[in-house]
Amino acid sequence: MADITVELVSVERMLWSGKASIVTAQTVEGEIGVLPGHEPLLAQLVDNGVVTIRPVDGDKLVAAVQGGFLSISKEKVTILAEYAIWADEVNTAESESHLQADDEISKARAEAELKAVRRKAEA
């Protein structure tokens, strides 16, 4: 089975690097699924999105992302996010409280975190 090299990087840390069978991300143009052999592309990520990675040797990985870019080349997929956190690391109660924040950045971040938690719970 063909696979694709993927890197998920935020401003603060490298979240993941490895081989995957598919990557999905939410861009300003809509959700995109990337399989091996995808045409090169550069896309802007939404401010409250979710990235899903299906590693070739493990369970589905889901991260909340805020802003950034998705870069697809013949060699790899690179997701450069302004902010990213694994769904497993999200404090749901804290994220829900941030939904009421006046700060739009905090609100968007909380929305992304809660979306990631829901997506992770899906089959």
From Swiss-Prot:
Location (main, coarse): membrane
UniProt GO molecular function: ATP binding; proton-transporting ATP synthase activity, rotational mechanism
UniProt-annotated location(s): Cell membrane
Membrane topology: Peripheral membrane protein
Top-level taxon of the source organism: Bacteria
Record-stated family: Belongs to the ATPase epsilon chain family.
Cross-referenced HAMAP family: ATP_synth_epsil_bac
Role according to the record: Produces ATP from ADP in the presence of a proton gradient across the membrane.
Protein name: ATP synthase epsilon chain
Species name: Corynebacterium diphtheriae (strain ATCC 700971 / NCTC 13129 / Biotype gravis)
Gene of this entry: atpC
